[in-house]
Amino acid sequence: TYDLVLQAVGRTPNGKKIAADKAGVAVTDRGFINVDIQMRTNVPHIFAIGDIVGQPMLAHKAVHEAHVAAEVAAGELLGNPELAAAAFNARVIPSVAYTDPEVAWVGLTEDQAKAQGIKVKKGLFPWAASGRAIANGRDEGFTKLLFDDSPEAHGHGKILGGGMVGTHAGDMIGEIALAIEMGADAVDIGKTIHPHPTLGESIGMAAEVAHGSCTDVPPARR
């Protein structure tokens, strides 16, 4: 039995409580502040970042939004066009569900790709074939990568998204985010030498599955 159950269902924006309107900043009916990809509000010299600009409400997203806003402001002040051109790319925000096992993902999902009519090639590596996962006694889970498989990619499509289910998935999702940021393809990731035995090498294995060169996947059960 329990004496108390705490249900946390999200955050409520306080845009209507900070007198933003007195500075001319527009606030939505729900209390959010709309910004562009440089984190500017409707008032060009005022920026906003974090939960108040909308989903996803994540600390690491807010930090990078702050970096963008600071770079743009500094670039304009110093006359540095490279800094002034900084922009926030929302497609490379990793998300983690801190459950047991953990679930982590970044970039495009299969459902999103299907909805957008994007043809993808999937590489899925089961942790049941991971030496480290087996040694840990936690081989439930998998690593999945999605690559552009459109005709224009000519078989060398860049990575569009990826996800992991398993222990410490959140600690490893950053590598997939970096691969998306750098425009890596399956060969790039598969040829990256990962230490063995580690959970992280499942990322390289998943890329090899997509490429058709993985030799570590167990045969399908009959």
Per-segment meaning from a language model:
Residues 4-82, 171, 175-177:
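FAD-site-proximal beta/loop scaffold in flavoenzymes
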Residues 14-19, 85-91, 126:
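Poly-acidic low-complexity segments
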Residues 40-41, 45, 89-90, 136-138:
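Solvent-exposed alpha-helices and their adjacent loops that cap or buttress functional pockets
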Residues 56-64, 71-112:
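Rossmann-like dinucleotide-binding cores of NAD(P)H-dependent redox enzymes
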Residues 93, 98-222:
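Flexible, glycine-rich terminal cap/loop adjacent to redox cofactors
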